[in-house]
Amino acid sequence: MEPRKNVTDFVLLGFTQNPKEQKVLFVMFLLFYILTMVGNLLIVVTVTVSETLGSPMYFFLAGLSFIDIIYSSSISPRLISGLFFGNNSISFQSCMAQLFIEHIFGGSEVFLLLVMAYDCYVAICKPLHYLVIMRQWVCVVLLVVSWVGGFLHSVFQLSIIYGLPFCGPNVIDHFFCDMYPLLKLVCTDTHAIGLLVVANGGLACTIVFLLLLISYGVILHSLKNLSQKGRQKALSTCSSHMTVVVFFFVPCIFMYARPARTFPIDKSVSVFYTVITPMLNPLIYTLRNSEMTSAMKKLWRRDLISSST
């Protein structure tokens, strides 16, 4: 389907046009992106190499880190480049590609967090059947399903926006291509289209978030049946999951579970779930996880020994 448009490229307005402020933001976002890449790559490598991190929880955690790597890379490099070089133009096709990648991995993360909550539920509420229920092929299927869910969500978003007429202006008041800022530039009535976007994005996020809250409520209720040591370990694991869920879902729900319009605060909220959350996820999951930190230390020592011999 060929897009009906006159606009061939867009201009991303970004955060500021002040050169001094752009330099400060460049350093800040570059640091955030480096920390995101290092932290998430470290988790992927550690889980892949370590023999002690073979449980489904770490398999899904590595999958989450991989998603965060691609998700962050679909947005941050162009943002950093624009702040450094001052080139904020993006072609129509590149804008659509960014939109597709960002939503396929963002959608996949939504479903994967639901899968991780189910894994946590089985581990705490059905510990004797955990290894039977969460067999390797089941984990692979659940991971694939989360990716398929993200793919379908992204295809639907792209199919909504791709064929719409963009007659001008071409200035996007944002730092990346997203649905609501793009709909603002469409030269036709977008009320019905906005409702579809809300249903596919905001409503889906809200339903999954409510399911997650219910599942964690059941898990917390089940903690009273565990020993004090088991309760502390389970509470540590679940609190990490819940922190990540809140950090990711609350901004997403604010952005997409509302009428298709833009607000000045949107850029700041978008930074939180596109830049900050992918950077914080490795810290949240590793700082309170003794098994993960121990495996990372062993991997670090092994690298030091091999490099010195």
Swiss-Prot record:
Transmembrane region(s): 24-47, 56-77, 99-118, 138-156, 194-217, 234-256, 268-287
UniProt xrefs under Pfam families: 7tm_4 (PF13853)
Database matches in InterPro entries: GPCR_Rhodpsn, GPCR_Rhodpsn_7TM, Olfact_rcpt, Olfactory_Receptors
Keyword Membrane found: yes
Membrane topology: Multi-pass membrane protein
Residue intervals on the Extracellular side: 1-23, 78-98, 157-193, 257-267
UniProt keyword Membrane, yes or no: yes
GO molecular function: G protein-coupled receptor activity; olfactory receptor activity
Predominant place of localization: membrane
Any single GO CC term annotated in Swiss-Prot or TrEMBL for this entry: plasma membrane
Glycosylated sites: N6, N87
CDD domains: 7tmA_OR4A-like
Sequence ranges on the Cytoplasmic membrane side: 48-55, 119-137, 218-233, 288-309
Lineage top rank: taxon: Eukaryota
Disulfides per UniProt: C95-C187
UniProt subcellular location: Cell membrane
Keywords per UniProt: Cell membrane, Disulfide bond, G-protein coupled receptor, Glycoprotein, Membrane, Olfaction, Receptor, Sensory transduction, Transducer, Transmembrane, Transmembrane helix
Functional note: Odorant receptor.
Family note: Belongs to the G-protein coupled receptor 1 family.
Protein name: Olfactory receptor 4A47
Naturally occurring in which organism (per UniProt): Homo sapiens
Gene this chain is encoded by: OR4A47
